[in-house]
């Protein structure tokens, strides 16, 4: 979930060598040709990254993250004056870019159910406070709440121009919870914008990320108490089907192929290939059959990484969509 800069959306129509997965509904894909005046220049990534709390040793990581989110928000056409509801804001990496995009006349309500002390090396509370103290901080209102509870609470009559779920779908405890959230958003937001990993790799070096995500998802679904970043690794088709069931219609969809600066694939593959993953399986899984499946899944990740012969693991494709 960190930055591909100026890379354009690549679709199967534009690249016939990519195997097309089954699609729920074929729609127009966003391209540079139909961008609006709301486009944020990639050159602003450094400034936007400064709004977020960053380890002094790794400024490039935060810049890459900002670049990626600039790409997403440009695809969605979010701009000055928009009232945005962000579901699953986490530490606010997307929030910072949204706040820049909406300008002084717009606003961002950023909702996340995680406790304030969640996260490392910085907690949710620390990261959000840093953004609040930045040049765009007064455009953001943080809500530490379950999204559905928030929508049914004192904000029961509030409406937004757009609701955003940027790399937050996989954090949901289940597809049922996602469906309930999307139903609650219907009638409250004019548009729904979703970005999530696509479970496909246009770059061969991203294959280990796909395998690692599936392995992690299988492990985390063994525990109802999991708070890991991959609990519901839904495919684009599955997300679109859930959205359709909640009353949403696909407006546009396409793929972003991340550049090498987006390191999530590298991190996720490394996590699954590590011995700590083996210990997690031993601690959390009692069924021998499931242990065997997870051992094989980890083996596939290790083998895929070794096949790269030292090349760094890339991050898988990202599905970018909007609904009305």
For the regions a language model picked out, list residue spans one by one.
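A short, conserved alpha-helix within the catalytic core of class I
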Residues: 171-184
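C-terminal lobe and adjacent flexible extensions of AdoMet/dcAdoMet transferase-like proteins
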Residues: 257-324
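Conserved alpha-helix/loop element of class I SAM-dependent methyltransferases that forms part
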Residues: 63-82
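Short alpha-helix
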Residues: 230-247
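S-adenosyl-L-methionine
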Residues: 120-153
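Conserved SAM-binding loop of SAM-dependent methyltransferases across substrates and taxa
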Residues: 91-104
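A conserved beta-strand element that flanks and buttresses the S-adenosyl-L-methionine
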Residues: 164
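Conserved class I S-adenosyl-L-methionine
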Residues: 191-217
């Amino acid at each position: 979930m960190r930055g591909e800069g100026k890379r354009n959306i690549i679709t199967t129509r534009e690249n016939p060598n990519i195997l097309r997965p089954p699609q729920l509904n074929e729609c127009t894909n966003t391209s540079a040709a139909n961008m609006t005046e709301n486009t944020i220049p990639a050159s602003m990534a450094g400034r936007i990254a400064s709004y977020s709390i960053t380890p002094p040793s790794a400024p490039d990581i935060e810049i890459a993250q900002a670049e990626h989110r600039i790409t997403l928000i440009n695809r969605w056409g979010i701009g000055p004056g928009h009232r945005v509801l962000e579901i699953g804001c986490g530490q606010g990496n997307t929030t910072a870019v949204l706040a820049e995009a909406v300008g002084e006349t717009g606003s961002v309500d950023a909702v996340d159910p995680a406790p304030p002390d969640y996260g490392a090396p910085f907690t949710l509370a620390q990261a959000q406070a840093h953004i609040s103290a930045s040049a765009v901080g007064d455009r953001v209102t943080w809500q530490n709440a379950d999204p559905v509870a928030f929508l049914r609470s004192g904000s029961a009559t509030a409406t937004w121009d757009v609701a955003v779920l940027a790399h937050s779908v996989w954090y949901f405890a289940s597809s049922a919870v996602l469906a309930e959230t999307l139903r609650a958003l219907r009638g409250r937001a004019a548009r729904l914008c979703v970005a999530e990993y696509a479970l496909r790799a246009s770059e061969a070096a991203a294959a280990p990320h796909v395998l690692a995500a599936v392995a992690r998802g299988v492990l985390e679904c063994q525990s109802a108490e999991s708070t890991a970043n991959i609990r519901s690794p839904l495919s684009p088709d599955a997300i679109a089907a859930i959205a359709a069931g909640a009353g949403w219609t696909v407006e546009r969809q396409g793929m972003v192929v991340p550049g090498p600066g987006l390191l999530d694939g590298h991190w996720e593959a490394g996590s699954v290939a590590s011995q700590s993953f083996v210990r997690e399986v031993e601690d959390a899984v009692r069924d021998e059959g499931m242990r065997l499946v997870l051992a094989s899944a980890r083996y596939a990740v290790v083998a895929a990484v070794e096949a790269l012969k030292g090349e760094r693991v890339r991050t898988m494709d990202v599905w970018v969509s909007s609904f009305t």
